[in-house]
């Protein structure tokens, strides 16, 4: 949870990589995560998250396209990694019906399953969703922390105050 533009999706992908990649993984596994094509990684990033993104209603299964919703993905066992991870970005756009469809997976996740829900407005989620999640609040860095990071990267001749506020 946090304001727009703080890197929540980047953080979610980093956490996902740590959960899916191990010492036996190869560069192809890393590339598959980066391109959102890893078989144990489901990345939902729509402008509006609708009920069919979470679960299919009866007679809505598409044999050609196969697995296209979060709940069906979560019900499967991992195929190449020890864990499986579903990331739902823009969760603040889910209506109550979509959130309720996700509840079962949050209440009783299968083993080695992680669900990362990204929102710009956590108050838009149902209390039942919020209460079943571990919340990580992503806050903007202050100037001192940004300068320390710049120095750690070997950029000591630049100060964060050298940039206009819209760039930081």
Predicted regions and their residues:
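Clamp-loader machinery-focused feature within the broader ASCE/P-loop NTPase space
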Residues: 1-97
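Charged, glycine-rich active-site and insertion segments that engage polyanionic ligands
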Residues: 1-34, 111-113, 121-168
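CheY-like receiver
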Residues: 72, 104, 148-152
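Conserved catalytic/switch belt of AAA+ P-loop NTPases
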Residues: 74-75, 98-117
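A short beta-strand-to-loop transition that corresponds to the Sensor-1 phosphate-sensing loop
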Residues: 89-91, 117-122
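Short, well-structured alpha-helical interface segments that form or flank functional binding sites
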Residues: 65, 97, 101, 120, ...
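Hydrophobic/aromatic beta-strand patches that form the interior of the parallel beta-sheet core
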Residues: 42, 86, 116, 134-136
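Proline-centered helix-kink/hinge sites
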Residues: 39, 78, 109-110, 141
């Amino acid at each position: 949870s946090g304001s727009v533009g703080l890197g929540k999706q980047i953080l979610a992908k980093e956490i996902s990589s740590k959960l899916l990649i191990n010492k036996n993984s190869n560069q192809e596994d890393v590339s598959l995560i980066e391109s959102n094509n890893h078989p144990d990684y489901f990345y939902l990033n729509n402008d509006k998250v609708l009920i069919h993104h979470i679960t299919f209603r009866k007679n809505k299964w598409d044999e050609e396209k196969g697995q296209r919703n979060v709940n069906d993905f979560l019900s499967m066992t991992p195929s190449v990694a020890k864990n499986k991870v579903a990331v739902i970005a823009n969760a603040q756009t889910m209506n109550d019906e979509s959130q309720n469809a996700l509840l079962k997976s949050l209440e009783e996740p299968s083993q080695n399953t992680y669900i990362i829900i990204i929102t710009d407005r956590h108050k838009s989620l149902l209390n039942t969703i919020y209460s079943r999640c571990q919340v990580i609040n992503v806050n903007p860095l202050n100037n001192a922390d940004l300068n320390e990071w710049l120095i750690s990267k070997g950029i000591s001749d630049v100060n964060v105050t050298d940039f206009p506020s819209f760039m930081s």
